[in-house]
Amino acid sequence: MANLATLDHPYLPQSASLLFDAKAKANLTFEDIARHIGRNEVATAAIFYGQAKASKEDVVKLAELLRLPAQALEMQMGGFPDRGRSVDMPPREPLIYRLYEIVQNYGYAYKAVLNEKFGDGIMSAISFSTNVEKETDDDGNNWAVITLRGKW
C-alpha cells in the first residue's frame, strides 16, 4: 500500500498529506480509488502527488470516498499543479532512479525510432496517458509493463 512520508517530500502540495493519510486510514489502493473516481490508477496517484489537476468531480468523489470535507479538499486542490519539482535530479529513490535510467539509456533510441515513424516532432506529456500492468511469465517471474501514450 503506497503511503507518504511528507518530510521526505518537501515540495509536495498541502493536499498530499491529507490525501495520503485518508488513503491509509481507509486501507485503499490507488486501484480502489481510481475505480471510484473513474480514472486509471496512475492518473489517480498523480493527483495525490500534485502532478495532475483534479476536476471538481474528482474532488467530490475523493472527499466522499476518503471521508474528507469536500470544501477543504477543494481549497487545497483548487490551484494548478506545480509539475516536475517533486523529484530530485538525479532521483535518489531506487525505483524512480531506474525509470530515469531507462530514459538515460534508451532516450535517444526512443527519439530516433519515434522520428522515423512520425517525422519531426515531440510526444506530448500533456495530451498523455500511462498505464501499469503486471505480467507473470511461464517461469513465474513478474514483469512490469508500463505503457506511455502521448499525442504526436
UniProtKB/Swiss-Prot annotation:
Name of the molecule in the record: Cyanate hydratase
Top-level enzyme category: lyase
Known catalytic reactions: cyanate + hydrogencarbonate + 3 H(+) = NH4(+) + 2 CO2
A GO term, aspect molecular function: DNA binding
GO BP annotations listed: cyanate metabolic process
Family per similarity comment: Belongs to the cyanase family.
Gene: CYN1
Pfam families attached to this UniProt entry: Cyanate_lyase
Active site: 98, 101, 124
Taxon lineage: Eukaryota, Fungi, Dikarya, Ascomycota, Pezizomycotina
Organism the protein comes from: Uncinocarpus reesii (strain UAMH 1704)
EC number of this enzyme: 4.2.1.104
